[in-house]
């Protein structure tokens, strides 16, 4: 294969071709061609639309697709021609935008100044900052890159839990980085993902249209392919900035584009790519990608969805949802925790949460609880409330200023949630998967007071049908349930607590990181999955 022409950064259409270095890393045949500018191209140096790729064959000059159209109509032919043309555009564009940092250890060497690739004297390849790419030096700390986005608090919480588990289990053997790939490494409007999510969630109809409208494979695959044409270079730079040995996605939008980039440069054998799903039951189809090394599912329900999406059994592990390692530590006595939090040491307590942003009917529920947990005949409280307002300082200030008839503690953003849960007897929260998993580990019966359509909808029957809690959107009904649990229905509270403990998986995060450690250790012998995106 002839080396591509040297192109300076000032060129209007820079092209970076590393196939001399990538020879031997992939089993697919490559055939160079030329575009109208005279640059050397390669059929595999592209991000493919819905799994399409052009095969250089004298007999077959047509574009083949993993997705077949079972129609001979003119409409079907037109659609196939459109997709073929669009795929050619993606291939032409992406050959010019994937950055120099994507260099892999290969069988054919280049001079030290070709395409910005430098060697370290031992046959390894150095990246932009002179650091060896993954797999080059066995003595260096292995690097883990966790991809997340602040669309809700659960993704960051899972990322932090995984990082803490790596640090606790392996110490300096791993360096763990967390990045919001879209916000930190892509241009406008792609870097507005968290803001867009928050807007859509606040407008339920728009969110439902977005969630269910993008569920079909042909829709979201087409969307990712089109998006790749604009941000492939930025995504590649964002990934290789860290020179990762492991890439972990804890967000449904953090695998398709990165995997396309890695595949286009032949790095799927070099980097272990895993997905840690953070939805307990229902989850968006974008969570699943056939090219991942491993897909960690929190429940058998999610594992079944993964298999239906085409993942092999060997790719799927069901360990549970990763929660902070601090939740695995022995529970301190309730009296001690309540004393530290300024709570009454003897009264039963309910934990009222609204997520990291303090959303939901917290004030209305708190007022209803204050009435229900006050015995007018005795003139005293029969329960107490611990309210977590998250980052909602306005709500925290308002609730703190009220005169309550029962003991009420109002807190802002909390980092030691395990202590707050350990001090209480039950919890009221929206159906966020992370909070549910943490509550189960602490054996707290759960009252769900809301959910986000789509990904959180399945969490409600998951809790209710497993006998771990109840669901109601009515503050008055919720307060009655709590009052009954603290009184005549105390036996039900105890049974639900036992059910929650039975369903809990506190060791999930440790099982996940140890499995990843084994994947890295064996990565040179792992077979590469041969399938389309």
UniProtKB/Swiss-Prot annotation:
Pfam families linked to this entry: Glyco_tran_28_C, MGDG_synth
Major location (coarse): plastid
E.C. numbers: 2.4.1.46
pH dependence: Optimum pH is 7.5.
Cellular compartments per GO CC: chloroplast envelope; chloroplast inner membrane; plasma membrane; plastid
Induction of the gene: Induced by illumination and cytokinin treatment in etiolated seedlings. Not induced by phosphate deprivation.
Regulation: Activated by phosphatidate (PA) and phosphatidylglycerol (PG). Inhibited by galvestine-1.
GO BP field: embryo development ending in seed dormancy; glycolipid biosynthetic process; thylakoid membrane organization
Transmembrane domains' residue ranges: none
Effect of residue 430 to R: Abolishes catalytic activity
GO molecular function terms listed in the Swiss-Prot or TrEMBL record: 1,2-diacylglycerol 3-beta-galactosyltransferase activity; UDP-galactosyltransferase activity; UDP-glycosyltransferase activity
Binding site for a 1,2-diacyl-sn-glycero-3-phospho-(1'-sn-glycerol): 155, 189
Keyword field contains Phosphoprotein: no
Quaternary organization: Homodimer.
Family: Belongs to the glycosyltransferase 28 family.
The name this protein goes by in its record: Monogalactosyldiacylglycerol synthase 1, chloroplastic
Organism: Arabidopsis thaliana
Gene: MGD1
């Amino acid at each position: 294969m002839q080396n591509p022409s040297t192109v300076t950064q000032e060129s209007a259409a820079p092209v970076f071709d590393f196939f001399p270095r990538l020879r031997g890393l992939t089993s697919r045949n490559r055939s160079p061609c030329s575009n109208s500018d005279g640059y050397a191209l390669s059929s595999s140096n592209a991000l493919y639309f819905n799994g399409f790729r052009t095969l250089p064959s004298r007999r077959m000059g047509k574009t083949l697709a993993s997705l077949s159209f079972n129609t001979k109509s003119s409409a079907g032919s037109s659609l196939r021609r459109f997709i073929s043309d669009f795929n050619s555009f993606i291939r032409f564009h992406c050959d010019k935008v994937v950055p120099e940092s994507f260099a892999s250890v290969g069988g054919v060497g280049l001079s030290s100044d070709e395409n910005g690739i430098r060697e370290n004297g031992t046959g390894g390849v150095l990246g932009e900052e002179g650091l060896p790419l993954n797999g080059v030096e066995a003595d260096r700390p292995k690097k883990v890159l966790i991809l997340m986005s602040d669309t809700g608090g659960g993704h960051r919480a899972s990322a932090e839990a995984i990082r803490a588990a790596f640090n606790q289990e392996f110490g300096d053997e791993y360096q763990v980085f967390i990045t919001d790939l879209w916000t930190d490494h892509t241009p406008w409007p792609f870097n507005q993902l968290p803001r867009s999510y928050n807007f859509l969630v606040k407008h339920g109809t728009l969110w439902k249209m977005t969630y269910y409208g993008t569920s079909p494979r042909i829709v979201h695959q087409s969307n990712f392919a089109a998006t790749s044409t604009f941000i492939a270079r930025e995504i590649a730079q964002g990934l290789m900035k860290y020179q990762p040995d492991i890439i972990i996605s804890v967000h449904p939008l953090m695998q398709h584009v990165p995997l396309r980039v890695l595949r286009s440069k032949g790095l799927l054998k070099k980097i272990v790519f895993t997905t840690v799903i953070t939805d307990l039951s229902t989850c968006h189809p974008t969570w699943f990608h056939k090219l991942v090394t491993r897909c960690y599912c929190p429940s058998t329900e999610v594992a079944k969805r993964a298999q239906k999406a085409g993942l092999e059994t060997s790719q799927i592990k069901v360990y549970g949802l990763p929660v902070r390692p601090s939740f695995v530590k022995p529970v301190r006595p309730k009296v001690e925790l309540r004393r530290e939090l300024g709570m009454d040491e003897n009264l039963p307590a309910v934990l009222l949460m609204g997520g990291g942003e303090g959303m939901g009917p917290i004030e209305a529920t708190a007022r209803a609880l204050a009435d229900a947990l006050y015995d007018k005949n005795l003139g005293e409280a029969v329960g107490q409330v611990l309210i977590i307002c998250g980052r909602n300082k306005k709500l925290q200030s308002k609730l703190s200023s009220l005169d309550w008839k029962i003991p009420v503690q109002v807190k802002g953003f909390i980092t030691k949630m395990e202590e707050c849960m350990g001090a209480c007897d039950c919890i009221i929260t929206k159906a966020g998967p992370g909070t549910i998993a943490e509550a189960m580990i602490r054996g707290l019966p759960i009252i769900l007071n809301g959910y986000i359509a789509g990904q959180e909808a399945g969490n409600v029957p998951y809790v209710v049908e497993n006998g771990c809690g109840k669901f109601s959107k009515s503050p008055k009904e919720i307060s009655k349930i709590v009052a009954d649990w603290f009184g005549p229905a105390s036996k039900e509270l105890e049974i639900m607590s036992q059910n929650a403990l039975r369903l809990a998986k506190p060791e999930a995060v440790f099982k996940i990181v140890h499995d990843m450690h084994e994947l890295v250790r064996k990565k040179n012998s792992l077979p590469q999955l041969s399938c389309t995106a």
